Amino acid sequence: MLISANEMCFSYAGESLLENIHFTLNEGDRVGLIGGNGEGKTTLIRLMLGELYPEQGEIFKKSGARVGYLAQNGGYDSYNTVWEEMLEIFAEDHRLLKSLSEVENAISQVPEGGEEYRRLAARYESLNKQIAARDSYGVEVKIRTVLGGMGFADRTEQVIHTMSGGEKTRLKLCRLLLEEPELLVLDEPTNHLDVRTLFWLEEYLASYKGAVFTVSHDRYFLDKTVRQIYELEPKKAIRL
């Protein structure tokens, strides 16, 4: 279980917005949420994220669960280039590869069979195991795959600060996909996608290892990417 709500209620400005909400999100779930404007979809997300708290009932989140959230128009600003920003996600992989290179260099300068050689060889083996487990050598391929799919293949050296709001939102989605959180929460993710990037995202999410919770008005996109859908009617959620 990643997130579970039981008899959850929430009011805004004295008006009841959500009443007796029940749902459970498990590892690997694909859930969609639809509903009209003002019926509490974003409020429900904020309750899930712990940004708001229910007035009645309970909501539980798995301890230590990594959650990635794409808000509507939820881009971010940075003076890094696109490539620099994506590489930051894999700082540990960079550290491991750098350490391996340093150990390789050190091994080449000590006699074989000695105590220092054995110590370095053990360190080399340990680093190699960590790198293999994390697929650190595949980092650049991962980044180029996601950036290419989302339309940034030829813009890796562009400074993020110079981009439009829609482009920054798409780039935030790229970052979330590369971070691979246990739960990916997407609020209207198709707003800034063209047909090509939309199709690519549908295919990518099909093989995503974590759980995905998507709010969208695009029912076709939901039908392609989720396994169950809730409709948020006034004050309650109903599974379709």
Question: Where is each model-derived feature located?
Answer:
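ABC ATP-binding cassette signature C-motif
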Residues: M1-L240
